[in-house]
Amino acid sequence: MVVMNHVLTGSLVLVRHAKAESGEEGEDHARGLTSRGRAAAAEAGRWLATVVPAPDRVWCSSAARAVQTWEAIAPSLPAAVAPVVDRALYLAGPHDVLQWLAGSPGATSVVVGHNPTVEQVLGSVTGELRGVRPGAVAVVDLASGRLLDFWDPQR
């Protein structure tokens, strides 16, 4: 895939934050994970450790639920890198994510974010429309645009 005159290579791990508390009280950005969401994210981390090597870089939304999702996944990964926690990803569109990916060719990159961006990036890279539930993880080969694996907490 070519983005801004860069050929995307490497692997993309797209993570939609796990199940979050309802937004009835307080600000959306501050919503944390439910106990079920924390358990699903930890399970996703154990699964991910069997599928991809240690990530080279991680871009994580600064929303509490996204940070907590990464914190539950990371302990299962070998030599997990510190994430770049960025408020910009909270409102980022697919183009922003693809631009970020273009910055490190050949890397295994993890993006922990929100819908609709996660589904839109997955569709842009693979050419297939697919629903991504809270806590789901997609692993994509960027050079071919092929979906290599998909984990759904409700499988």
Can you annotate each of these PLM segments?
Residues 103-111, 115-135:
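Non-DNA-binding regulatory cores of transcription-related proteins
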Residues 7-86, 92, 128-132, 136:
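Active-site-proximal alpha-helix that buttresses catalytic centers in soluble enzyme cores
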Residues 1-11, 50, 144, 154-155:
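Short, low-complexity, intrinsically disordered N-terminal peptides in bacterial proteins
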Residues 126-155:
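Domain-level recognition of soluble alpha/beta enzyme cores
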Residues 43-48, 114-118, 140-144:
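Short C-terminal domain-edge/linker segments immediately following a structured domain
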Residues 26, 101, 122-125, 151:
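Short, flexible helix/strand-to-coil boundary loops that buttress conserved ligand/catalytic motifs
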Residues 53-54, 78-81, 104-108, 126-128, ...:
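Short glycine/proline-enriched coil/turn segments at helix->beta-strand junctions
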